[in-house]
Amino acid sequence: ATYKVTLKTPSGDQTIECPDDTYILDAAEEAGLDLPYSCRAGACSSCAGKVEAGTVDQSDQSFLDDSQMDGGFVLTCVAYPTSDCTIATHKEEDLF
């Protein structure tokens, strides 16, 4: 399946198509968006965003704790969409 992922960035909202087997960060880059990242392995917070609607699978991540995930935070470098979703990007500073 392919889902519509709306990314709310500081420079405006962008909606991309993201297959359910593609990490959201990778799909965003393929669409020409410049999102923050560092490790690309789900082990830091550089790429953190916040899910505002919809669902994602970020079971590959190892950095966020349960309360952060329950709060909607997502590491876009290891997150697959599992529905159409809306994610606010550039949220690393909100984690701490």
From Swiss-Prot:
PROSITE patterns: 2FE2S_FER_1 (PS00197), 2FE2S_FER_2 (PS51085). It is found in: Plastid, Chloroplast. Its cofactor is [2Fe-2S] cluster. InterPro entries: 2Fe-2S_ferredoxin-like_sf, 2Fe-2S_ferredoxin-type, 2Fe2S_fd_BS, Beta-grasp_dom_sf, Fd_pln. Residues 3-93 form the 2Fe-2S ferredoxin-type domain. One of its GO terms (biological process) is electron transport chain. Binds 1 [2Fe-2S] cluster. It holds the Pfam family Fer2. It comes from the Eukaryota. Keywords: 2Fe-2S, Chloroplast, Electron transport, Iron, Iron-sulfur, Metal-binding, Plastid, Transport. One of its GO terms (molecular function) is 2 iron, 2 sulfur cluster binding. The keyword Cell cycle does not apply. GO terms for cellular component: chloroplast. Signal peptide: none annotated. [2Fe-2S] cluster binds at C39, C44, C47, C77. Ferredoxins are iron-sulfur proteins that transfer electrons in a wide variety of metabolic reactions. NCBIfam families: fdx_plant. Belongs to the 2Fe2S plant-type ferredoxin family. PANTHER family: FERREDOXIN, FERREDOXIN-2, CHLOROPLASTIC. This is Ferredoxin.
